[in-house]
Amino acid sequence: PEIATRIAQYELAFRMQTSVPQLMDFSGESKETLESYGTKGADGTYASNCLLARRLAERGVRFIQLYHRGWDHHGGIKNASAGTAKLCDQGTAALIKDLKQRDMLKDTLIIWASEFGRTPMAQGSGRDHHIKGYSMWMAGGGVKGGMTYGATDELGYNAVEDVVSVHDMHATMLHLLGIDHEQLTVRFQGRDFRLTDVHGNVQDRILA
């Protein structure tokens, strides 16, 4: 069985490698699709990667991560943020619209987040890391659309209403993927660990 498993792994790796040229060939995409994403082809831009994400999802890839590097605005935030937002907004919006048009959005969970937010007050020409109150958004499979959950204080500094912890977020994400977070464990150094540790509650009010 171990030899058969190893052979299967090599065969899977080969199939993945040989599928890349077709995956990266955007010539079959319409002009309207390319323009909606804001890309001319597989050029490595964020917009191009958004389109690539849709193509990966069509081929059954279950986890896809996109990222944009340009948000580390410790300086020059006034000049940088508008352009950075535009680059992200167009491709992201096109991806959601494209998935919906293809009847894929209902089966795809989209999570837009970063590891922390930014302070509500400027520090020089930029803003520092901030973990006490920041936003993220979700769309697609199982998520209730058109709603805002939680709130910060009047300064935008502390989360004060319907605060969602990282463990709560993980519990909710796993629930949307059909996984009970209290049953999912990973064994490490003789102990079974949960992703949500001994915490985490599914946030039912954001579920469709």
Residue positions per predicted region:
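Ligand-binding pockets and gating/stacking loops
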Residues: 1-208
